[in-house]
């Protein structure tokens, strides 16, 4: 231990450390070594000295070195060179030796000491190999039993995978979840009394199959059985295995071997020259014929119920029974806009309104096609020359109020719900209808109750964020004049949404694409309800007091909103609607609301707010929905399927039709009858008829029972409107409220009225 420290070790300390007394030691002091390390120190010293007893560190130990073994610089074995094992005899000798004694052959190994020839293993070597295979110590293996690894493991890293096959897994101990659910249902049924145990139900008759009854194989078809079971009496009642005779042996042969001759000593067995010389040949033909008859009479396969494909299809009635429905185009109107997104008829059908991309609501007369009104509900002004990304504000939907005493059209344009006075009258005095309309929409700011994230803009002022600003110019019902003099004129003008600047920027930065949207109130536009996101759909209640709006944006805080005009109140009943909402419909006979999403439709009770049921159309994505004044609810999908829910009852549709080749864009149901119109991007309008109770009562005995609550296609309209590239499609369809007339609009801005 007198070696000097290496340079690398001594460089880490300074001479000042020793001089300052950090390591103080006297000359007489000795280094004390614990007793438990004394032996190891002696071994290290003996191995490190370069004397006669030890070996130098630079030389490897005296271990037997094989010429074919590869070592590293530390003397460790890292591999062996390829050895050419000599031939162990011919292949035939090898094969014979292997099959002579299989157990002894597989106990031999190649011994390198004997020139890589096969040598037998001793019992001790076999035991050693066997102990290594089962992970036992080979020195005292006979006295040890098989060790349990989990019992000897003392550290906290428990092995999750068992190394032995005697551990039973959890799946073999316990039953599956499906079996547990079935047993739980059976237990509940027994407790409720629905399942009654009958001990004789599954009792097997011991004599069953032993007694064969008489059957009439050649009888006619039983009249009491199902007509589709075209099986004679008794032919399909049971299955009989065909008779199989025993194969003849040597004793029955006409030319038996010699050892079978004269076995009994009576000379009955004899050797004949041909088969015809035996005694039983006289009945051979009869026996074969009887066997053929037996094989024919017994059924050769298990007969099944045969279904005729034509019998499964219902018999379609004559098209004359489905009338009336539109058959020809009576009028064509070119509006001048590119795309039309809103179509609606007045309550009596004398006028219809159209809205599209130009944000102008046009009102036409039904019988002449003359344009009566053109009301701009939204206008835009470009502030910059270059504009690429711009939010296209257009009319998404428009619905006419079903009340006949007022003239109101609800328009969804941008993020606003706009109430427009059409300025027409279908019955009664025009001035009275106009006064009622303005009185219904002339709300006061202090009495309105909008949602926290919405704002109501009226002629009397603005209500937004829980604050109301009154204006001095209030619309008078009698003289239609504006009186000024209110103190809140400036506050109302500052809060009024006359100018809204929509910027497509982030973090407050002004982008080059800037548009100014002008939304003003005039003699036709009486009320605006501002939402936070794009309003894509609206629908009236049949009484004309409630209206529901739908925002399809996923970031919208209120996807479905209810507005009541009589009380000037807004309500957002659903806070957690994760899926994308397509539309919403009121039920006519019940106070229920149907909310349509991409995958399903949910029915809610408006009085309690509870979810009553869920309708699953079974399609990938719902794109359109329709519901008339009845309870028949219809959905259309992106895969061109149309599903009917008769009376909106049951989670699954009662009927499905697939006559389109592209996505269905709109569906409308006639309010008076069961006519259904669907339009698609393929430029086709499909007219179908629902077989309901009224149609069956009108034509008794003409419709099959399988056709009840089904849709029957009547006619295909507007096939010529599809362009060569398929760019022209049908976007909207709507029915006349009192006549079987259909109005449809395309993506080219052309209206067609079918009668």
UniProtKB/Swiss-Prot annotation:
User: Which Pfam families does the UniProt entry name for this protein?
Assistant: BOP1NT, WD40
Keyword rRNA processing found? yes
**Interaction with EB1, as annotated region:** 309-754
Where is the region Disordered? 1-65, 482-505
GO molecular function (one): ribonucleoprotein complex binding
Question: Compositional bias (Basic and acidic residues) spans?
Answer: 496-505
Principal subcellular localisation of the protein:
nucleus
Cellular component terms per the entry's GO annotation: nuclear membrane; nucleolus; nucleus; PeBoW complex; preribosome, large subunit precursor
Top-level taxon of the source organism: Eukaryota
Give the location in the cell.
Nucleus; Nucleus, Nucleolus; Nucleus membrane
Q: Keyword set for this entry?
A: Membrane, Nucleus, Repeat, Ribosome biogenesis, rRNA processing, WD repeat
Q: Does the keyword rRNA processing apply?
A: yes
Q: Which InterPro entries match?
A: BOP1/Erb1, BOP1_N_dom, WD40/YVTN_repeat-like_dom_sf, WD40_repeat_dom_sf, WD40_rpt
Q: What induces it?
A: Expression remains constant in trophozoites and in encysting cells.
- What biological processes does GO assign it? maturation of 5.8S rRNA; maturation of 5.8S rRNA from tricistronic rRNA transcript (SSU-rRNA, 5.8S rRNA, LSU-rRNA); maturation of LSU-rRNA from tricistronic rRNA transcript (SSU-rRNA, 5.8S rRNA, LSU-rRNA); ribosomal large subunit biogenesis
- Where composition is biased (Polar residues), the residues are 1-10, 43-61
Q: Where are the WD repeats?
A: 335-374, 617-655, 659-698, 725-755
What this chain does, per the record? Required for maturation of ribosomal RNAs and formation of the large ribosomal subunit.
Family (UniProt):
Belongs to the WD repeat BOP1/ERB1 family.
Alphabetized PANTHER family for the sequence: RIBOSOME BIOGENESIS PROTEIN BOP1, RIBOSOME BIOGENESIS PROTEIN BOP1 BLOCK OF PROLIFERATION 1 PROTEIN
How it assembles, according to the record, is:
Interacts (via C-terminal WD repeats) with giardin subunit beta. Interacts (via C-terminal WD repeats) with EB1.
Protein name as annotated: Ribosome biogenesis protein BOP1
